[in-house]
Amino acid sequence: MQLTSFTDYGLRALIYMASLPEGRMTSISEVTDVYGVSRNHMVKIINQLSRAGYVTAVRGKNGGIRLGKPASAIRIGDVVRELEPLSLVNCSSEFCHITPACRLKQALSKAVQSFLTELDNYTLADLVEENQPLYKLLLVE
């Protein structure tokens, strides 16, 4: 299964925020500079992450964005469920003649659930804590 760029960059934004020293805020511009993503795309991602409670946005002169929960409380599987459209096949099409007997959707659904269950074993903290090579690449030591 390949994640959409929306989910990919959502996870990367969370990784960046989790890599920062505790309490440090960042900005959407800073995140887009680190990953070379369009600002408009990142604004949409951060808005969805904010609505889901993964990111807190603070307005004003000293505002910015930061994690909305501790990194140890953010399960990667939950983030993927929030950001990723998980329907792998469109079985509602009237043009598919095998829909009444097809078992593909069920098989793919089970595969997606296995994928998400495995991702549920990891938190954001698992990906960033004590990861010096990551900090060097993100320049956040």
UniProtKB/Swiss-Prot annotation:
Q: Does the keyword Transcription apply?
A: yes
* InterPro entries in UniProt: TR_Rrf2-type_CS (IPR030489), Tscrpt_reg_Rrf2 (IPR000944), Tscrpt_rep_HTH_NsrR (IPR023761), WH-like_DNA-bd_sf (IPR036388), WH_DNA-bd_sf (IPR036390)
Alphabetical keyword list: 2Fe-2S, DNA-binding, Iron, Iron-sulfur, Metal-binding, Repressor, Transcription, Transcription regulation
One Gene Ontology term of the molecular function aspect: DNA-binding transcription factor activity
Q: Which Pfam families match?
A: Rrf2
The residues covered by the HTH rrf2-type domain are: 2-129
Entry binding sites for [2Fe-2S] cluster:
C91, C96, C102
Cofactor annotation remark: Binds 1 [2Fe-2S] cluster per subunit.
Q: Does the keyword Transcription apply?
A: yes
GO CC, sorted alphabetically, is: cytosol
Cofactor dependency: [2Fe-2S] cluster
Q: Which GO terms describe its biological process?
A: negative regulation of DNA-templated transcription; regulation of DNA-templated transcription
Residue stretches spanning the membrane: none
UniProt superkingdom = Bacteria
Q: Which residues bind DNA?
A: 28-51
Function recorded in the entry = Nitric oxide-sensitive repressor of genes involved in protecting the cell against nitrosative stress, such as ytfE, hmpA and ygbA. May require iron for activity. Does not regulate its own transcription.
NCBIfam families, per this entry?
A: PRK11014.1, rrf2_super
Q: What is this protein called?
A: HTH-type transcriptional repressor NsrR
Task: Give the classification, highest ranks.
Answer: Bacteria, Pseudomonadati, Pseudomonadota, Gammaproteobacteria, Enterobacterales
